Amino acid sequence: MREPGFWHRPPSLVSRLLLPIAAIYGNIAAARMQKAGTTVGVPVLCVGNYHMGGAGKTPTTLALVALLREFGETPVVLSRGYGGRLQGPVQVDPSRHSAADIGDEPLMMARRVPVVVARDRTDGAALACALGATVILMDDGFQNPALTKDASLIVVDSHRSIGNGSVFPAGPLRAPLPLQVARTDALVVVGDGTAADGLAQQITTKGGVVLRARLVPEPASVEALRGRRVLAFAGIGDPARFVATLRDSGVEVVEQRAFADHHPFTAEELAELAAAAKRDGLTLVTTEKDLARIGGAQQALGVEIVPFAVTLAFGDEAKLRLFLLDRLNGARAAKLAGRR
């Protein structure tokens, strides 16, 4: 879905006209969020958003995977598998599954960490535990009440923040903001913008943790594009941020194409991109997530598509480590006490 422009502008007439529907949607979402969830035998850490679209959940999840492994943990990622056809629960196998089966993000992450896809998150958690998980990382699912969460980390872009602050469809929020803030343990602010400063203050006031982070291009990706003129395309939550990251890395972006988040590229669209690149002597570059959706279709194009990989770097990693250790220890103590 491509986000309406008015979501990221001050409240407009269109937004105000949609407020009655937003109130109904918000009440339903709030009631659902407050339902009791199933408690799992291992800590459950949720990485989510307040709003529709992306803000950097997947890089955040992978960064947490790396830290948890340093602690000696065995993390397994649990995903709904947005955009995939399989109901699950199923462990993602990159050699067997496609993005059409299990979604682009699970497929991309499964090359680095065990990933379970399940529409029913309780069933998915059971499979994750059977695979030996000592910690479950929920990729999205903050508003889903199926599992009791031991910590919720919310990712927000520092330039876009939460848009006009209204609930869908008047704005991008998935549920009323006060309820979401109340259930947030840590806010991960990605980038050097100031749009999320007010939100960060709300989290600090309620006793939550604010973590600053930035997306860092992997050196190999930058080197692969050195001296090349590129046509950048992406179907993610914020394609403009992808292009900005490329340019900030010194990549010469000559042309760009933006698609809706999780866009299923057709053969015709890919052929048009390939033709444009050949015509103008450009290199096609996209995100790892987009390349996961394209899959084997690129082989028929006759041109190379270069994935541009990024990782998330935290400004105060020690603060994050303390937060994670505190939550893991607290969760385990509570679960142990509950079994007595």
UniProtKB/Swiss-Prot annotation:
Keywords: ATP-binding, Kinase, Lipid A biosynthesis, Lipid biosynthesis, Lipid metabolism, Nucleotide-binding, Transferase
The enzyme's E.C. designation: 2.7.1.130
GO CC list: plasma membrane
Keyword Cell inner membrane: no
Gene Ontology biological process terms, A to Z: lipid A biosynthetic process; lipopolysaccharide core region biosynthetic process
Metabolic or biological pathway, per its Swiss-Prot or TrEMBL entry: Glycolipid biosynthesis; lipid IV(A) biosynthesis; lipid IV(A) from (3R)-3-hydroxytetradecanoyl-[acyl-carrier-protein] and UDP-N-acetyl-alpha-D-glucosamine: step 6/6
Pfam families per UniProt: LpxK
SUPFAM superfamilies per UniProt: P-loop containing nucleoside triphosphate hydrolases
Binding residue positions for ATP: 51-58
Catalytic activity: a lipid A disaccharide + ATP = a lipid IVA + ADP + H(+)
Keyword Ribosomal protein on entry: no
Domain of life: Bacteria
InterPro entries named in the record: LpxK, P-loop_NTPase
Disulfide bonds: none
GO MF annotations, alphabetized: ATP binding; tetraacyldisaccharide 4'-kinase activity
Family: Belongs to the LpxK family.
HAMAP family in UniProt: LpxK
Function: Transfers the gamma-phosphate of ATP to the 4'-position of a tetraacyldisaccharide 1-phosphate intermediate (termed DS-1-P) to form tetraacyldisaccharide 1,4'-bis-phosphate (lipid IVA).
Name of the protein in question: Tetraacyldisaccharide 4'-kinase
Organism: Rhodopseudomonas palustris (strain ATCC BAA-98 / CGA009)
Organism lineage: Bacteria, Pseudomonadati, Pseudomonadota, Alphaproteobacteria, Hyphomicrobiales
Gene: lpxK
